[in-house]
From Swiss-Prot:
Topology class, membrane: Multi-pass membrane protein
Subcellular location, record wording: Membrane
Disulphide connectivity of cysteines: none
GO MF annotations in UniProt: allantoate transmembrane transporter activity; dipeptide transmembrane transporter activity
Gene Ontology terms: biological process: allantoate transport; dipeptide transport; tripeptide transport
Cytoplasmic side: 1-80, 146-154, 201-213, 270-317, 378-389, 436-453, 505-543
The protein's name in its UniProt record: Allantoate permease
Family, similarity comment: Belongs to the major facilitator superfamily. Allantoate permease family.
UniProt source species: Saccharomyces cerevisiae (strain ATCC 204508 / S288c)
Amino acid sequence: MSADASTNSNASLDEKNLNITSEAEIKNEDVTAEPVLSTVLSPNGKIVYISDKVDEAMKLAEEAKEIEVTPEEDRKLRWKIDYCMFPLMCILYAVQFMDKISTSSAAVMGLRTDLKMHGDQYSWVTSAFYFGYLFMNLGPVQFIFQRTSHMSKMLAVFIVIWGMLLALHAAPTVKYPSFIVLRVLLGCAESVVTPCFTIITAQYWKTEEQFTRVSIWFGMNGLGSILINAIAYGVYIHQDSYAIKGWRTLFVITGVITIFIGILIFLWIPDDPSKARFLSKREKLMVVQRIRSNQQGFGNHEIKKYQIIEALKDVRTWLYFLFTVSSNIPNGGISSFMSILLNSDFGYSSKETLLMGLPTGAVELVGCPLFGILAVYAANKKIPFWKYKLSWAIFAAVLALIASCMLGFATNSKKARLAGAYLWYISPVSFICVLSNISANSSGYSKKWTVSSINLVAYAAANLAGPQTFIAKQAPKYHGAKVAMVVCYAVMIVLLSILLIVNLRENKRRDKIAAERGFPEETENLEFSDLTDFENPNFRYTL
């Protein structure tokens, strides 16, 4: 290549503000075979080619660019989205948790006796659910839901199916083997809710709003716990009035409720903001404008292999994975065995156990949203350390560690152990923070789905293993399970601290690079180009 050609090449690149000094650097990049709309320089110094396979929000981006949204309009739109989307989302999340832990209440209502369970067989009832959950998140969930343009409709179908499966738990012909099969299938059906909700949250709310929203809908697990204990108590005290056993009646009731909620989801929740019947044309454009700062849009229905590979190479993916394993081994055990602990370890009767389970849900229902609100307040006030959401996750993990120690080692005080059991229900705050991190910090639709799926594989595997820490021969104290909880929460604190440091350092590095590059001409609608967080120079990680 001649010197003149080299000079011309460099000049053309400088005109694009790419800060590339030689044509060789372009040749080192993998140029896509797809039509190239534009190029951008990633934070790692690589040229990124933007193809025509962009985010769904790009269809509205040009039109949205022309409108101006006042702070008052933005506030009203946010409240409208909250009002129209959130109640049904919260109810569904409460119902899915109610269904998931229904076996815990059924266990003290005669389930174990009627199905002739012995030894560790009850532990496998819970683990079976997570075998199905694990299988679906190994790939099927991502393939089905990323490829479809009707995400909420597909979600509704899965909800109705799991409602039917739950009602089938009550069939008089169900024995232990068939009950296990039903639990596996139920896990398959329920596995879709959390990843779908993570995507929906990113579609409608800004990154700074997402932690509070995830805290609220995930905190509805507490409402689900209250509902299942209340329904179970009502069934238990009137069980002589039914033609079938009380625990079978419980599954029929919860199954019918779930089917009804699935129908409502199908009729009301839109597939993405552009299809929301409760939003006017202008409001749909306003949604596009308000999520520009997220550096991501509604999603892309093509599965991009390079984004999957990037997700596998991202250290955050594996920090999420290890954290989720650590946080959900205790969760898998306590969710299934809390009623049994109250009954056998604390000495409450079956009737008292169902009542004593109510406060556990109240702690989670109030505590999780409260942490989300406090985190937003601290961020707005820029309070050192506490302005980071991950700081609140670390604090919640410390509380969970204290609660586990109280539950496991306060052997001389029943009240202290009971207080620890209740305080433990604040522990989901840490997991909520990680879910909101995945929603906000994993950019690129295929990458987001991949990271979410890997995280939920860890969730399923840990919840599958959790009940196995409750060894039958250690009943009623289950000392080994309590020690495992303490170890897991100690590991969680370390992992969350590492995640915070990694994101802080990367944001500082990107700020430094941006300052050195100056202010190049902005690539139009870059945030809706379906770029990953590794590719987008404007992306900063939520802390």
